[in-house]
Amino acid sequence: TIEGSYEGQPPNIIDVVVRDRRWAQGNLQHLAIVGQAGLTPMGRVHLGMGAASYLISGIWALSLVVGMVLALQGGQFIPSYFEDSKTLFPIWPIIDPGAALRLFMATLAVVFLPKLLGLLLELKRARAERSVKHALRSTIGVAYETVFSMLIAPILMITQTVGAIQIFAGLDSGWKAQKRDDGALSFYDAMKFARLHTLIGALVAAIAWKVSPGLLVWMAPVVAGLLLAGPVSWLTARPAGAFSRWSLATR
């Protein structure tokens, strides 16, 4: 093999982003051949899913932008419940809170159901082993992973969106040897890496607050992940230490 070309687990989130950018370029390049003759249907699905996995972040970011623009427009919109023609019957806006609730619950199911099923499986094993410690570690581990993944998701949303734009603009990521052993990351370097995330987080928070404090609460998971991108990135390079003994149900 080419020296240093093999892939391994990156030691911190900055190196994850570097690897992710390289993988994104490879997967998005497949869009050029996914429609070519000679591929099986499953092969097309496989290539399409690989490319889509790096486009989803951009779609998520775009949906947030569109949602905030609509919220800003809604705050300045003066409703009119009557047409220009004279009528005694108002035209009420169509609002379907039931559909919104169903969509919200479906989203929660997609995000949390796999975690819940995994936790239930571990609790079942803990009960069979009569191990309170196993059950406690499993529960703490799921809670820790849920919070940490919530904070990391907005970070990757920004980096993957920027990466996709760079790829479509023709910018090559190259293939440098991956850092595997030394995961050290200074707090300064972490904050420098996260400066764009922090700026976007502050801007989103300010706009959301201007529209409605309720909107800021609704967007709190995204805003928190962006504003805390620096400290969270720094934490990914720190050793887990004693915490790993109480947060991971490993065997």
What are these regions (language model features)?
Residues 109-125, 160-167, 206-213:
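Transmembrane alpha-helical segments in integral membrane proteins
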Residues 146-164:
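Hydrophobic, aromatic-rich membrane-embedded alpha-helical segments
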Residues 163-188:
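Membrane-helix boundary/interface segments in integral membrane proteins
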Residues 179, 187-251:
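C-terminal amphipathic alpha-helical interaction region
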Residues 1-142, 146, 150, 238-251:
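Non-transmembrane catalytic domains and loops of membrane-associated enzymes and transporters
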